[in-house]
């Protein structure tokens, strides 16, 4: 089943010029893509290529300058109030900047309950039980429930944001560089959790990243973005190779997992 369909999406931002006239800076240009239930897809590209702008459009935080975004066959622009509430539950996003994504005055307990209060019909006791369950799923314990964001490490807060997104059992989870910053052990644990959710609920995942290793470990398909356009789409197999210049640049930039020892005869 197709969850998300994007057709000919373009977006620009207006900036004031010295002459007083607005100048338009194009960020996305004719982007089209689809995501299906249970699918794991990566959007790969260097910083500034338009990935994060696209993610904001996909979750409805901004409206595109041109083109259409459909969720389960319905255009986002035409959703009624009840449909929009269901959409906000079905599609959740975890941002790279976790500090800006939470209220620093709220406790972790309040942060986790927030989407459940607004999007689910659960009693308070059920919300608290699920909050604890989601914390354990991301390798945190109940001792953080009464803490506030400034009292947590960056990795802990990122996992709190992930737990908050998972609490409403979304159909699509968008992770904007949200896993790349975790250490390898935590990253592996999060990936195991996401795979479990896919098996149980058919949750689709869109990884917005520059981390090719993450793509190779977890994703089924990868789209390469460059200068606001998707320039290549590849299935992820044992040997992932790119045909686009942007894809090859990203692949060549990856360091080996372990340092390569020089032979004794090699000159330094």
UniProtKB/Swiss-Prot annotation:
Q: What is this protein called?
A: Nickel import ATP-binding protein NikE
Tell me the PANTHER family matching this sequence.
D,D-DIPEPTIDE TRANSPORT ATP-BINDING PROTEIN DDPF-RELATED, TRANSPORT ATP-BINDING PROTEIN
Membrane topology recorded in Swiss-Prot or TrEMBL: Peripheral membrane protein
**Which species?**
Escherichia coli O157:H7
Per the record, the similarity remark reads: Belongs to the ABC transporter superfamily. Nickel importer (TC 3.A.1.5.3) family.
- What Gene Ontology terms describe what this protein does at the molecular function level? ABC-type nickel transporter activity; ATP binding; ATP hydrolysis activity; nickel cation binding
- Enzyme Commission code(s) on record: 7.2.2.11
SUPFAM superfamilies in UniProt: P-loop containing nucleoside triphosphate hydrolases (SSF52540)
């Amino acid at each position: 089943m197709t969850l998300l369909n994007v057709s000919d999406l373009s977006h620009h931002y207006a900036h004031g010029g010295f002459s007083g006239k607005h100048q338009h800076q194009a960020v996305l240009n004719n982007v089209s893509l689809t995501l299906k239930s249970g699918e794991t897809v990566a959007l790969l590209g260097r910083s500034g290529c338009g990935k994060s702008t696209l993610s904001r459009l996909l979750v409805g935080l901004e409206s595109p300058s041109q083109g259409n975004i459909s969720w389960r066959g319905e255009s986002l622009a035409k959703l009624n109030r009840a449909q929009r509430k269901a959409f906000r539950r079905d599609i959740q996003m975890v941002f790279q900047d976790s500090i800006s994504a939470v209220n620093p005055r709220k406790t972790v307990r309040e942060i986790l309950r927030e989407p459940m209060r607004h999007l689910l019909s659960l009693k308070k006791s059920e919300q608290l039980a699920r909050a604890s369950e989601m914390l354990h799923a991301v390798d945190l314990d109940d001792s953080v429930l009464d803490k506030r964001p400034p009292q947590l490490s960056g990795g802990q807060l990122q996992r709190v944001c992930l737990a908050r997104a998972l609490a409403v059992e979304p159909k699509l989870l968008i992770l904007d560089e949200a896993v790349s910053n975790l250490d390898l052990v935590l990253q592996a644990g999060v990936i195991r959790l996401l795979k479990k959710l896919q098996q149980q609920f058919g949750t689709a995942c869109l990884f917005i990243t520059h981390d090719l290793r993450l793509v190779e470990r977890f994703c089924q398909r990868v789209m390469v973005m460059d200068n606001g356009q998707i320039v290549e789409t590849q299935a992820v197999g044992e040997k992932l190779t790119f045909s686009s210049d942007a894809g090859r640049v990203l692949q060549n930039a990856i360091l080996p997992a372990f340092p390569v020892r020089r032979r004794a005869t090699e000159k330094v």
